[in-house]
């Protein structure tokens, strides 16, 4: 697949490592401060940014993924924030998923990554309510988790290392593999490859991923850009 790829605007944060489009705009998570910002999804200004609607602090740490569902934000805390800032008592020791109030940043739920270790990506399943997809990096797998009892219902293998952003489609699930600059569409049942997008070196590196209408958006934690992929 060879879609159109274009830079849209720069994040309000220097290290955006997760994003999620909602009806209000696009949420962006900062890996350093673990704040989340809601910004307008519009043409960028002369300064290369869009208008900030609000931003809120969270109890996440080393945030490496963002999703939205059940009227809440879901943040992937990839261990403590010691690489970026002073450690807080709320930091995760290893990977955790936090359900967060989008108005206040209050933690509503907190769950361990299935089988432990770190994580870079998650996706609230809008085709099957009550489920969320969560990566377990050390095992190179993606789990479908039932939220009510935090139990793994299904697992598919991931084809490459350093998996990142995740987007569920009706007929598959897209997963970013940052180091390989690939966004792979996987079959839901067995994880077989259905399609792929190669992001060449002329474009920012893909990290977080979100659906945006019929298109995809991704953010680059190294350059701060938000990028659009048009099919």
Give the residues covered by each predicted segment.
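A short beta-strand motif characteristic of beta-propeller blades
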Residues: 4-10, 47-56, 106-112, 151-157, ...
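Beta-rich, blade/repeat-based domains predominating
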Residues: 10-23, 58-71, 77-80, 113-128, ...
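Conserved beta-propeller blade signature
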Residues: 25-28, 73-75, 131-134, 173-175, ...
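Residue-level signature of beta-propeller blades and closely related beta-rich strand-turn architectures
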Residues: 32, 79-80, 138, 179, ...
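A short loop-to-beta-strand structural motif that recurs across blades of beta-propeller domains
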Residues: 35-37, 86, 95-98, 141-143, ...
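Short loop/turn segments that connect beta-strands within beta-propeller blades
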Residues: 40-45, 101-105, 146-150, 187-191, ...
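Short, conserved, GDST-rich strand-edge loop motifs in beta-rich repeat architectures
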Residues: 76-93
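Blade-level signature of beta-propeller repeat domains, shared across WD40, Kelch, NHL, RCC1
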Residues: 205-231
């Amino acid at each position: 697949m060879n879609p159109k790829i274009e830079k849209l605007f720069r994040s309000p944060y220097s290290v955006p490592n997760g994003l999620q489009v909602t009806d209000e705009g696009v949420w962006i998570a900062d890996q350093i401060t673990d704040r989340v910002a809601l910004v307008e999804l519009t043409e960028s200004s002369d300064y290369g940014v869009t208008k900030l609607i609000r931003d809120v602090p969270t109890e996440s740490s080393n945030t490496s993924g963002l999703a939205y569902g059940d009227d809440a934000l879901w943040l992937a805390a990839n261990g403590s924030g010691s690489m970026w800032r002073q450690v807080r008592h709320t930091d995760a020791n290893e990977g955790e998923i936090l359900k967060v109030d989008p108005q206040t940043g209050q933690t509503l739920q907190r769950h361990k990554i299935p089988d432990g270790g770190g994580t870079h990506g998650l996706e609230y399943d809008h085709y099957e309510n009550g489920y969320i997809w969560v990566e377990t990096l050390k095992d190179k797998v993606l789990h479908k988790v039932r939220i009510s009892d935090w139990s793994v219902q299904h697992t598919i293998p991931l084809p490459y290392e350093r998996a990142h952003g995740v987007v569920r489609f009706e007929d598959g699930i897209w997963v970013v593999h940052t180091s390989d600059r690939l966004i792979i569409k996987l079959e839901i049942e067995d994880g077989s490859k259905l399609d792929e997008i190669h992001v060449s070196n002329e474009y920012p590196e893909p990290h977080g991923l979100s659906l945006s209408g019929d298109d995809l958006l991704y953010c680059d934690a190294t350059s701060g850009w938000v990028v659009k992929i048009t099919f």
